[in-house]
From Swiss-Prot:
Gene3D superfamilies, per database record: lpxc deacetylase, domain 1, lpxc deacetylase, domain 2
GO cellular component, one term: membrane
Keywords: Hydrolase, Lipid A biosynthesis, Lipid biosynthesis, Lipid metabolism, Metal-binding, Zinc
Protein's name in the database: UDP-3-O-acyl-N-acetylglucosamine deacetylase
Pfam hit, one: LpxC
Pathway assigned in UniProt: Glycolipid biosynthesis; lipid IV(A) biosynthesis; lipid IV(A) from (3R)-3-hydroxytetradecanoyl-[acyl-carrier-protein] and UDP-N-acetyl-alpha-D-glucosamine: step 2/6
Organism: Rickettsia typhi (strain ATCC VR-144 / Wilmington)
Recorded family membership: Belongs to the LpxC family.
Catalytic reaction annotation: a UDP-3-O-[(3R)-3-hydroxyacyl]-N-acetyl-alpha-D-glucosamine + H2O = a UDP-3-O-[(3R)-3-hydroxyacyl]-alpha-D-glucosamine + acetate
GO molecular function: metal ion binding; UDP-3-O-acyl-N-acetylglucosamine deacetylase activity
EC numbers for this chain: 3.5.1.108
InterPro entries, per database record: Ribosomal_Su5_D2-typ_SF, UDP-acyl_GlcNac_deAcase, UDP-acyl_GlcNac_deAcase_C, UDP-acyl_N-AcGlcN_deAcase_N
Enzyme class name: hydrolase
Active-site residues per Swiss-Prot or TrEMBL entry: H263
Length: 289
């Protein structure tokens, strides 16, 4: 299997869920072995590019933010990163004229649509995978995330909220599953009381029922159209996981299991994997059974 990029550039406009500001984002083709690079076109400096890497993650409080050594940053990258992973795009340059990736409808589906419209191009370099060789685990109280050796990518993810609108949900994602069909359109979600507080602090300025699932104090989903899936919440958490893990710069081959995961946990797992060179090896598709 070969690396791939886009056939042609593709653009969109949208608002940032936290900044509330309208930005233009363009995904462009890139050469083999480039990886995923963000460029802030609103900053006229040669230091305006940021590699979408786990070691550049600078904030994980409400979303995943990456920054470079010059404190140039791009936030809320996880839904776009998940779409790039789900569409098997290895190399791309993402140009954006603001500090936050547009939230679109709160899922990865609009970005998947963009990539499908642009088309995919196979490149003259083999696609590589990161194969996990031993168990790697991160734990904090009752939250945990770990990966174990496997010949395929599988995920067993559980979320557990006190809200009756969400409750406890579990999802198993196997090699036969389709991210673009079953996961990509699951939207982000939040509680109205939290959104009101965040807005008072200058955050969530772009949040609305058009780009997020809203839950009130009575555990009721307020979106007029309701949910896209009964388990849309855990599907979106899986989407976030895939997006965050793709900041590894490579597709990970492992059996992954998580309970009450977060952006911080996802990033911590990557740091732990790459801190131990005996825990993984790079392989091509021909080396996978």
């Amino acid at each position: 299997m070969q690396q791939s990029t886009l056939l042609k550039p593709v653009s969109c406009y949208g608002i940032g869920v936290h900044t509330g500001k309208r930005t233009q984002l363009t995904i462009e083709p890139a050469k083999e072995n480039t990886g995923i690079i963000f460029i802030r076109t609103d900053i006229s400096s040669e230091n305006n590019y940021i590699e979408a890497s786990y070691y550049n993650v600078s904030d994980t409080l409400l979303s995943t933010t990456i920054s470079n050594n010059h404190k140039i940053q791009v936030s809320t990258i996880e839904h776009l990163m998940a779409a790039l992973w789900g569409c098997s795009i290895d190399n791309a340059v993402i140009k954006i004229d603001g500090p936050e990736v547009p939230i679109m409808d709160g899922s990865s589906k609009p970005f998947v649509f963009m990539i499908e419209c642009a088309g995919k191009k196979l490149q003259n370099a083999p696609k590589k995978y990161l194969k996990i060789l031993k168990e790697i685990k991160v734990v904090n109280k009752d939250c945990e995330l770990y990966c174990t050796p496997s010949e395929h990518i599988t995920v067993d993810l559980t979320i557990d909220f006190s809200s009756k609108a969400i409750g406890k949900q579990n999802l198993n994602f196997g090699v036969q599953e389709s991210f673009t069909k079953n996961i990509a359109d699951a939207r982000t979600f939040g509680f109205i009381k939290d959104v009101e507080y965040l807005k008072s602090k200058g955050l969530a300025q772009g949040a609305s029922f058009e780009n997020a699932i809203g839950i009130d104090e009575h555990d009721k989903v307020l979106n007029p159209s309701g949910l896209r899936y009964a388990d849309e919440f855990v599907r979106h958490k899986l989407l976030d996981l895939f997006g965050d893990l793709y900041t590894s710069g490579i597709s990970i081959v492992s059996a992954i299991k998580g309970y009450k995961t977060s952006h911080a946990f996802n990033n911590e797992l990557l740091h732990k994997i790459f801190s131990d060179t005996t825990s993984y090896k790079f392989v091509t598709s021909n080396e996978l059974s």
